[in-house]
Every structure is written in C-alpha cells, then in structure tokens.
C-alpha cells in the first residue's frame, strides 16, 4: 500500500509540475526586435537615426555590461522619439543609466520644447525590464511599440 501511495504521489507531483506554466523570456537578437519596430507604422517620425547601444553616450559607464542593444531616435531634434532596447548582464545599472538620461536630457522635452506631444511622450515614457532585456520608449505611440517588443521576447 505504501508503494502504491508513493507512486501515486510521484505521478501527481510530476503531472502538476509538467502542467504548470512558467513565463520564460525568449533569447532573441535585439537586431530582430529593431527590424520589427523600425517602420513607419510604429515609428511615425521619419527618418530615424540608428545607433549601437555600446556607442551611445548614455551607456558610456555601463557599456561593459551590455551584451547587445540599439538606440533609435528621430533625426529631427525638435521631435522626441526614443526607443532603446538593451540585452544586459546588469539590468539595474542599465536602468539607472537610462533613468539619468530621462532626468537630465529629456527635461527640455518634458517642459514642452517642440510641442505638447513631446511633453506627453516624456510623461508616458516606459522604462521596463523583462529578463535580461531593458527597454525605454519615449514616443507618441509608446504602448504599441512596447506591445511589439513584449510580443517578441515573451
């Protein structure tokens, strides 16, 4: 009877573990993410400047922690459209670097430089992390861009 109870418990445990859901992050190259979001539908302000995250001045102090990443920005300096996606081994350091950028460099946009759309983009900006990925979006349609990023990495 004990053997039967042990076997039943083992089968039940394996069944529950096998049926449980885990939310894993896919290991996708950030270049694939960039290709999916770098279009006129999601990035409405064209043309767009593309920069490797390791070469972008915001990440100067954390570039050794960056595995790969990109920065997309509007080439028109009075329109705010920033999209950063970085794969890193130190999420908190990269998030802090972006937070510093947001506080220091985006202040003029938050104060209304370039129009009300820019102030709204700063107020509605998104700085999040999922697994080893960190993304920052300050753009008129940040929610749509975020949805595309999450669709790809989850």
Annotated model-derived regions:
Residues 48-80, 93-94:
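Short, compositionally biased low-complexity segments enriched in polar/charged residues
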Residues 1-5:
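Positively charged n-region of N-terminal signal peptides that target proteins for export
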Residues 81-89, 133-138:
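Second-shell loop/turn segments in exported
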Residues 91-131:
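Short Gly/Thr-rich strand-loop-strand
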Residues 117-154:
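A short, solvent-exposed beta-edge/loop patch
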Residues 15-18:
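C-terminal motif of bacterial Sec signal peptides marking the signal peptidase cleavage site
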Residues 20-23:
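Bacterial signal peptide processing site
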Residues 26-46:
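Post-signal peptide N-terminal segment of mature Sec-exported envelope proteins
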């Amino acid at each position: 009877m004990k053997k039967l109870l042990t076997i039943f418990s083992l089968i039940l445990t394996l069944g529950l573990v096998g049926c449980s859901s885990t939310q894993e992050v896919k290991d996708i190259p950030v270049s694939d993410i960039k290709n999916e979001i770098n279009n006129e539908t999601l990035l409405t302000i064209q043309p767009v400047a593309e920069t490797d995250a390791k070469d972008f001045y915001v990440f100067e102090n954390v570039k050794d922690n960056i595995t790969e990443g990109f920065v997309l920005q509007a080439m028109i300096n009075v329109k705010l459209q920033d999209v950063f996606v970085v794969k890193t081994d130190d999420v908190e350091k990269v998030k802090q670097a972006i937070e510093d950028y947001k506080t220091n460099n985006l202040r003029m946009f938050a104060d209304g430089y370039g129009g009300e759309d820019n102030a709204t983009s700063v107020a509605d900006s998104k700085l999040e992390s999922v697994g080893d990925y960190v993304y920052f979006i300050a753009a008129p349609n940040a929610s749509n861009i975020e949805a595309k990023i999450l669709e790809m990495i989850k």
